[in-house]
Design a protein with these regions (language model features):
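A Trp-anchored, charged/polar loop motif used as the substrate-binding/catalytic surface
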Residues: 7-10, 116, 193
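Ordered hydrophobic segments in well-structured contexts
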Residues: 11, 23, 164, 194-195
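Basic, ligand-binding patches in group-transfer machinery
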Residues: 1-32, 36-39
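Conserved S-adenosyl-L-methionine
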Residues: 187-197
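The AdoMet/dcAdoMet-binding core of the Class I SAM-like
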Residues: 34-183
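A general structural signal for short secondary-structure junctions and capping/turn motifs
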Residues: 2-4, 13-15, 52, 73-74, ...
């Protein structure tokens, strides 16, 4: 599937050499695929807060993508509402290609998909969330402002009492000092944070 929109060009294609696996590209950069390695990570981002004892029923997902993280969060029945922010609005329209992985989450009545920038949303909303799951694209693909102290502070301001932030951070294509710097920055805002690899 090929689509051009104001936000950019996005493509869903079969992975070379693996007819069963799909990849989604935004502006010619692979952002997510259906391979086991890709999916286990985004599912983990959604599930870990619950394993850590998350209480509450309202979640915010920054980076809806193909909906797998949102689907993982929705699988926990305590969740009554999930607001999902996605910069490339059209991605929700191709999420159905991944329905075996996301349980058609885009049609779940608890889910509200909002087109826009995650940081801008946090600046302008007054909502408080029990979980903020930040699952942006790789920082080298233009989402670097979603890995900064300013962004983490915004997340903290939008947490309900006892709330948690789950932050995706890739290991690939990231220099050691950049990876360490992001971890230190996150930990400076959330001193009780744990890192899962």
């Amino acid at each position: 599937a090929y689509h051009e929109t104001f936000e950019g060009t996005y493509i869903v294609a079969r992975e070379t050499g693996n007819k069963a696996a799909l990849s989604t590209y935004v502006n010619n950069s692979a952002v997510i695929g259906s391979s086991y390695d890709a999916i286990k990570v985004v599912k983990m981002v959604g599930h870990l807060p619950f394993f850590a004892g998350l209480k509450g029923d309202k979640a915010l997902v920054i980076g809806f993508g193909i909906g797998v993280t949102s689907s993982a969060i929705a699988s926990h029945t305590q969740i009554k509402r999930i607001d999902c922010i996605e910069l490339v609005d059209g991605l929700k329209d191709v999420a159905h290609y991944y329905k075996g992985l996301n349980a058609d989450i885009q049609y779940d009545p608890r889910v509200n998909i909002i087109a826009g920038d995650g940081r801008h949303f946090l600046l302008n909303t007054r909502e408080k969330y029990h979980l903020i799951s930040s699952d942006p694209t790789h920082p080298v693909l233009g989402s670097g402002n979603l890995y900064t102290r300013d962004y983490f502070e915004l997340c903290k301001q939008r947490l309900a009492p006892g709330g948690m932030v789950s932050q995706y951070l890739p290991l690939h294509k990231l220099r050691q000092q950049d990876f360490s710097g992001i971890i230190k920055t996150f930990h400076s805002v959330f001193p009780d944070a744990t890192v899962w690899l």
